[in-house]
């Protein structure tokens, strides 16, 4: 029985050594060889490495690790109390309560120091809220339509962006009133036509007098 176990262990060791030799020798004999600087470069998963291998970690990781060790070891003492809660009685309960309160005070102190704050100090400052004062104007009075008498013209004689159409308002207000009054005659086809009734009436009177 002992000899059979020894032979099986020896066979396993020889098989493991043979497998290692096979994996090292056969690829060297069958694989191709090439020389160059690119072959000597260090790469990880087919990607050429860049930068330094030493990464600068934030000090916050160090603080969190220290706090974890401290509170973890302190919480380990509570395990001893939990398995012997009946034996220690109320005295043990009061001792554990004081211990927990001490842990909470330490945690509050660490929070007050900002040890667990990951954001920079300037981002944690409360920004002043901008309060917009109500507008001191009446929107209805601004958007109401002004009559032709109230429109102000620019130097070219046009109303700048205050009328819906490009009405040419010159300094002769009376002529423009007469012209706008003529734009209310609609013919039988439904199209709006501009007819100067004063001119038409003058022409008709002249025709009658000539006849």
Curated annotation (Swiss-Prot):
GO terms for cellular component: NADH dehydrogenase complex; plasma membrane. Its EC number is 7.1.1.-. It is a multi-pass membrane protein. The keyword Membrane applies. One of its GO terms (molecular function) is NADH:ubiquinone reductase (non-electrogenic) activity. Gene3D superfamilies: NADH:ubiquinone/plastoquinone oxidoreductase, chain 3. The chain crosses the membrane at residues 7-27, 61-81, 88-108. It is found in: Cell inner membrane. Its main location: membrane. Keywords: Cell inner membrane, Cell membrane, Membrane, NAD, Quinone, Translocase, Transmembrane, Transmembrane helix, Transport, Ubiquinone. The keyword Transmembrane helix applies. It catalyses: a quinone + NADH + 5 H(+)(in) = a quinol + NAD(+) + 4 H(+)(out). It is an enzyme of class 7 (translocase). NDH-1 is composed of 14 different subunits. Subunits NuoA, H, J, K, L, M, N constitute the membrane sector of the complex. Belongs to the complex I subunit 3 family. NDH-1 shuttles electrons from NADH, via FMN and iron-sulfur (Fe-S) centers, to quinones in the respiratory chain. The immediate electron acceptor for the enzyme in this species is believed to be ubiquinone. Couples the redox reaction to proton translocation (for every two electrons transferred, four hydrogen ions are translocated across the cytoplasmic membrane), and thus conserves the redox energy in a proton gradient. This is NADH-quinone oxidoreductase subunit A. It comes from Psychrobacter sp. (strain PRwf-1).
